[in-house]
């Protein structure tokens, strides 16, 4: 996914970013980059998420990334959840992978995934 870094945060390597779907925050895991830098990245959601708590169905029809307090909220289509709990959220052409536990959820519907910890890795294209 293409992001534009908008500013540095207070934590070590924390950055705020903008995408075509909205704005968020995360920990930058690459060579230092300054504000106004655009780059392709992959998001890592390293928390173990609970279905029906951190992942909730929503009546949305558009992809979204936004900040809500200390959380980053990703709104996208729940593509798949494998038997081992690995889940995939579609945001436009990009997939965000996460680990989850809990009761089954319908696939192919819009959900919100709420996380506190987002790691951002630059993609080498």
Positions of the model-derived regions?
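Short, compositionally biased
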Residues: 52-68, 124-125
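Structural detector for short beta-strands of small beta-barrel domains
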Residues: 1-10, 60-83, 109-113
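Flexible glycine-rich surface loops and low-complexity tracts that mediate binding to linear polymers
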Residues: 3-6, 36-50, 76, 108-125
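Short aromatic-glycine-enriched beta-strand elements
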Residues: 12-15, 83-89
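Generic structural motif
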Residues: 6-8, 20-22, 31, 46-48, ...
